[in-house]
């Protein structure tokens, strides 16, 4: 059985590697062409375009891993079935259960690799790509309204809430366009702080540059409220928001790890903010490596198809269509779940469960009746 395992794994892994390399080459070319639009602007050269495309590769590999596994495994198994190698292995004692177990073990190994790439390598690459673009673009802008953060301090009648708006980040990583609104327990605006830029220290203290502070005394009448204004070149503003939470609000979701997504979702929940999108993203990222097991199970029935059921190229084409349909269903489930407010883990797990049931049903039917 060790020889059988070595034979199967060698062919499957080499096929998966070839498919992954082909996909990565295609996506690298597309990203490189896209980066060429900014060459010549603010000192950006073609080498920066090439480097930016390289930084995107780990993220593409993470997204393409299940599809590459499906296509590569189908190609290897279909080729073995057409050359009667798989038939010889079955005659030698490779039963359906044992074949499924061998592929499941290989799928588990690829699931671990996918998790490592998605949680450690891809976020670093995405952050480096964002930093490279921000350096030549003069900063990173966060949508039209910027990024919003909320914070609560105190308790009971002394509770105050803070709404923080960030326009984006500068080329050096400093926060830009900072606006901080403080409200009392009755929802009245107590103070407003605006600053050109600022940085967040590890202890949560914000160092604001060119800060303007406006205060409205809560005891005064609305029409006669004296406004106190103060301008400071440097202002230290204490906060309970960690640098990780601030970074999560400003940077794209692709730069966040599974743990960071969970922590940010918990922060949003504690501040009574919408968490559905981030919870769905967390569960999709947490369960995505399991798609490798599903793709292995989905590829196995192709080994039990008779050679007359189609050539290897036709079966590979079928695998490509299955992979595309899985990606479409996975993305569609996320958008529909967000619109319909479905349970996040159900939204993330449904596509993989459906394709797993489909693969097991096809595998059982082929083993019994073919």
What spans do the regions from the language model cover?
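Start (N-cap) of specific transmembrane helices in multi-pass transporter permeases
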Residues: 7, 11-15, 98-111
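Non-transmembrane, extracytosolic/lumenal segments of membrane-associated proteins
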Residues: 47, 107-223
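Transmembrane helix boundary and interhelical loop/hinge segments in multi-pass membrane proteins
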Residues: 73-87, 92
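Extended, hydrophilic extramembrane loops/domains of integral membrane proteins
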Residues: 244-270
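Transmembrane alpha-helical segments that form the functional core of multipass membrane systems
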Residues: 40, 273-365
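Long, hydrophobic alpha-helical segments
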Residues: 57-77
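Short helix-to-coil transition segments within interhelical loops
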Residues: 90-95, 340
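Hydrophobic alpha-helical transmembrane segments
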Residues: 1-59, 181
